Amino acid sequence: MPSNFFIPDPEGQVPSAEGYFGAFGGKFIPEALVAAVDEVAVEYDKAKSDPEFARELDDLLVHYTGRPSALTEVPRFAAEAGGARIFLKREDLNHTGSHKINNVLGQALLTKRMGKTRVIAETGAGQHGVATATACALFGLDCTIYMGEIDTRRQALNVARMRMLGAEVIAVKSGSRTLKDAINEAFRDWVANVDRTHYLFGTVAGPHPFPAMVRDFHRVIGVEARRQLLEQAGRLPDAAIACVGGGSNAIGLFHAFIPDADVRLIGCEPAGHGVETGEHAATLTAGEPGILHGSRSYVLQDDEGQITEPYSISAGLDYPGIGPEHAYLKDSGRGEYRAVTDDAAMQALRLLSRTEGIIPAIESAHALAGALEVGRELGRDGLLVVNLSGRGDKDMDTAARYFGLYDTDAEVAADGTGAAEIEGDAK
């Protein structure tokens, strides 16, 4: 019986044998990691054709994660988007609260197949870290999570969740102290402990085979959404919309729709304070081709090729690179990418909360802001599907400060400091 949930990429839509999507991708890594990365590629190739692997992952996705995730129409929210019909793919309802669990369970099974006993991971908003710590608790694996020091403050609740699950959380104090630097430290750890450790990479970036493998574990999002839209709306959408940081939730939604030429694929990047200010993380909007974290893609860099520091109110989108398949979709014209400011995202977060009773993650709110814009362009005949990639519990301190929801300035934040002392915007 074919798998219901683990559906590797269809023939003809895979990267080259060297891991390239057109001019983007590849494997640019130190010699010390070549054997480990190649082992992941070989083991994944075996797993893709192993019915037992598919059966085990399917069982976890159904009975542990709670798939299929719901497809929810949001008419009161859509009324602010010119009346276009808008459906949300509810990855926020998954166990651990985001799409991240899809990839994590797949890679955790691979870790066991490879005989590794320790997992490391990077995390920005903490959702990938929480999902990784969850899977390690489930499978009895040692777990170390690297997280930028600024992000540990912004996402103190998720730090506590990871530690409750038994993970060691290391606050990275180098560089910008955000996601980019957490990835750097995780790679250093992997080099030093490669024999017993698997790096459970959390997005569709990094060296081959990670971009294609992580995408395959997330393809279930779009496969389900496509089927659900045909059942609930009677047709395919005019556009599939998702936020884009590294790009995993977006490619998970987009990929099932790539053969459907009439379905626009729209990624919403973090414009921060505005692309023109330089304080943003809109890599496809303002970046140039370069190499970062083991692959060639678009990168935010200066005239000398040095990586510039990204900024976003969203810890999960605060990254100066992008998955190579997104770079390929952009250059081929199949994908469209728009930049969404902090303010537009936060206004969309509040609007969904107050019209539909759903509090989204700030990451997902960037996609919601994009949907409002696209809906107004399409009008009442438009049909949109938006990937609601995560829930907003983790972002309540940021949102409360942004909108002035605390009763006094002396309110205590999740990490025990005064709310005004925590880094990030207040409004």
UniProtKB/Swiss-Prot annotation:
InterPro entries: Trp_synth_b_CS (IPR006653), Trp_synth_beta (IPR006654), Trp_synth_beta/beta-like (IPR023026), TrpB-like_PALP (IPR001926), TrpB-like_PALP_sf (IPR036052). Its EC number is 4.2.1.20. GO terms for cellular component: cytoplasm. It is an enzyme of class 4 (lyase). Gene3D superfamilies: 3.40.50.1100. One of its GO terms (biological process) is L-tryptophan biosynthetic process. Keywords: Amino-acid biosynthesis, Aromatic amino acid biosynthesis, Lyase, Pyridoxal phosphate, Tryptophan biosynthesis. The modification N6-(pyridoxal phosphate)lysine is found at K100. Its cofactor is pyridoxal 5'-phosphate. PROSITE patterns: TRP_SYNTHASE_BETA. One of its GO terms (molecular function) is tryptophan synthase activity. It comes from the Bacteria. Pathway: Amino-acid biosynthesis; L-tryptophan biosynthesis; L-tryptophan from chorismate: step 5/5. It catalyses: (1S,2R)-1-C-(indol-3-yl)glycerol 3-phosphate + L-serine = D-glyceraldehyde 3-phosphate + L-tryptophan + H2O. Pfam families: PALP. Belongs to the TrpB family. The beta subunit is responsible for the synthesis of L-tryptophan from indole and L-serine. Tetramer of two alpha and two beta chains. This is Tryptophan synthase beta chain. It comes from Streptomyces coelicolor (strain ATCC BAA-471 / A3(2) / M145). The gene is trpB.
